[in-house]
Swiss-Prot record:
2-oxoglutarate binds at T194, R330, R334. SUPFAM superfamilies: Clavaminate synthase-like (SSF51197). Its cofactor is Fe cation. It comes from Streptomyces vinaceus. This is Alpha-ketoglutarate-dependent L-arginine hydroxylase. GO terms for molecular function: 2-oxoglutarate, L-arginine oxygenase (succinate-forming) activity; 2-oxoglutarate-dependent dioxygenase activity; iron ion binding. The gene is vioC. Pfam families: TauD (PF02668). One of its GO terms (biological process) is antibiotic biosynthetic process. Fe cation binds at H168, E170, H316. One of its GO terms (cellular component) is membrane. Its EC number is 1.14.11.41.
Length: 358
């Protein structure tokens, strides 16, 4: 287990948070630990129908405590630290031949070869909180897929490729956004980097910081929640009306919240704007954009690596790359995790883990 000497194991933010050399906390499984975790996931794949079935959603956090103890210790401690932008677990085995080709679309990405790995990601997530999905994103799947789609190379969603995916808080528009975003790399032959950045506190003057803590900013839903990016069967769902309302009439929010020395961040580089006519807010947002652009760093997830990005402390994106469309493209499984599922209770689409935007 690798831990920074500057970690803080406490619930309250420190008066000042030292920045470690590496802005994420990393753990490497031994071969025996990796085999044990994979075997546990394989048993789940045999026992349960699907990762988002109600029985497995309830059982996963309990089964997760059968994962190797050293891994559980790392996750329990790292999630309390004040500084890491992400928790990274390396060393999970992926049988590339058994995995099969990278699908051409997320609709066909629930493949037999990737099924045990989806269960593995769910088990890891169970050590951090409860998973959920969006009714307006990839047809309400809890485990979603990140892969390039032909024709979408220059879009503003994760299925883009030739265009860089801009930095963002995941689902920044919603008060029910994830606390963690989990990514499991099934395949990344070209070493395409995930980008991350935290709050550039050292470079923000006091007045700009004051403004960013005030509800003077508008954040609209990103394009992944649009009807056009979901199946035709989803077109009439009432949840899309809520997305349209959030896009047309967003409520002013603060970009920074919480402890001033270790604030939580809520921003989307492509979908955030100042309130109309608010020049001071526009200047503050412009300053923040420039500082985040300048502080972006890269995290490459190799095959089998898992990252849990702290969606409260860091924004993330992805570098541009040349898609192959030959069955060997970059492919990740993705999941949303909340520390408090009841926070979003009124947005549940029925008795499920799928959120609708009311």
């Amino acid at each position: 287990m690798t831990e920074s000497p500057t970690t803080h194991h406490g619930a309250a933010p420190p008066d000042s948070v030292a920045t470690p050399v590496r802005p994420w906390s990393e753990f490497r499984l031994t071969p025996a630990e990796a085999a044990a975790a994979a075997a546990l996931a394989a048993r789940c794949a045999q026992r349960y129908d699907e990762t988002d079935g109600p029985e497995f959603l309830l059982d996963a956090p309990v089964i997760a405590h059968e994962l190797p103890r050293r891994l559980r210790t790392f996750m329990a401690r790292a999630r309390l630290d004040a500084w890491p932008h992400a928790l990274v677990v390396r060393g999970n085995p992926v049988d590339d031949a058994a995995l099969g080709s990278t699908p051409v679309h997320w609709r066909t990405a629930r493949t037999p070869g990737s099924r045990p790995l989806s269960f593995l990601l769910m088990l890891y997530a169970g050590l951090l909180g409860d998973v959920f999905g969006w009714a307006t994103q990839q047809d309400g799947r809890v485990v979603t897929d990140v892969l390039p789609i032909k024709g979408g190379e220059h879009t503003l969603v994760s299925s883009s490729s030739r265009q860089e995916l801009g930095w963002h808080t995941e689902d920044a528009f919603s008060p029910y956004r994830a606390d963690y975003v989990g990514l499991l790399s099934l395949r990344n032959p070209d070493g395409v980097a995930t980008t991350l950045a935290g709050v550039p506190l050292d470079d923000l003057d006091e007045r700009t910081l004051d403004v960013l803590f005030q509800e003077r900013f508008l954040i609209r839903p990103d394009d992944s929640h649009l009807q056009v990016n979901n199946s035709t069967a989803q077109q009439g769902r009432v949840e899309f009306e809520g997305i349209a309302q959030a896009a047309d009439r967003p409520e002013p929010v603060a970009i920074l919240t919480g402890h001033r020395a270790a604030p939580h961040l809520r921003v989307d580089g492509d979908f955030s704007a100042p309130a109309e006519g608010d020049e001071e807010a526009a200047a503050a947002l412009g300053t923040l954009r420039k500082l985040i652009d300048a502080s972006l760093y890269e995290l490459v997830l190799d095959q089998g690596d898992v990252a849990f990005i702290d969606n409260r402390r860091a924004v993330h994106g992805r570098r541009a790359f040349q898609p192959r469309y030959d069955g060997r493209d970059r492919w990740l499984k993705r999941i949303n995790i909340t520390r408090d599922l009841h926070r979003s209770r009124k947005a549940w689409a029925g008795d499920s883990r799928v959120l609708g935007q009311r």
